[in-house]
Amino acid sequence: MKRWLLSLWVMLPAVGCFAQAWSLSTNLAAYADFGTMNAEVGYALGRHWNAMAAVRYNPFTFTSDDGPMQNRQRSLAAGARYWPWHIYSGWWVGGAAQAQEYNRGGIRSPETREGQRYGAGLSGGYAYMLTPWLNLDVGVGFWGGIDRYSVYECPVCGLTLGKGQKTFLLPDRLMLALSFIF
C-alpha cells in the first residue's frame, strides 16, 4: 500500500504537465505601417511543424497638408511552418494561403488603388528564445497571386481612372514579432 501511494504521489504532478503547443504573436514592425493591427495564432502539429492563422487590420486614414493618406486593409492567412531544429526555436520556413482587401492612396500621390488580392506566400526567419514563454521572431516573406483592383483619382473624389486584374509578387512581411508560447 505504501509503495502504491508513493508511486501515485510521484506521478501525480505529471498529470498537469502539458507541452508548449500554442503560440500567440504580434508583429511589432507592422504597427509602423500606418498602425496596422495584427495577430497570429499557431499550434504545434509535431516536433518540426506548426499550423498558423494570421489576421491584419488597418481602418485608419490620416490627414496631411496634401490630403488624406491611407493604407487600409483586412488580411487573412492560413498556413504552416517547418522548424528544422525544434518547434518555436531557431530557424523556420513557412508557406500560407492569403486573402486581402485593401485601399491605399494619398501617400506619394493623390491616386488611390483599392481591390482584393488572393494568393500564396513563402516566408522564413529565426525565433530567438527570450524566456521559455516568450520569443522574438525576425523574418521576411513574399507573396504572389491575383489582384482585382480599381484606381481612383483621389482618396475621396470617387472618379474612376481604371479597373483591372493582374498577377503580382510583393513583399508580404518584414517581421519583428513578439510571440507568447503556452
Residue ranges of model-derived segments:
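Positively charged n-region of N-terminal signal peptides that target proteins for export
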Residues: M1-W4
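Sec/Tat signal peptide C-region and signal peptidase I cleavage site
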Residues: V15-A19
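Residues that define the transmembrane beta-barrel architecture of outer-membrane proteins
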Residues: Q20-W22, D33-M37, Q70-L76, E114-A120, ...
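Extracytoplasmic loops and strand-loop junctions of Gram-negative outer membrane beta-barrel proteins
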Residues: A21-L24, T61-T63, G105-S109, C157-K163
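Solvent-exposed loop/turn segments connecting transmembrane beta-strands
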Residues: S23-E40, N58, S64-Q70
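Gram-negative (and chloroplast) outer-membrane scaffold detector with strong preference
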Residues: Y43-V138, A177-F180
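Predominantly the C-terminal beta-signal and adjacent terminal strand-loop region
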Residues: T131-F182
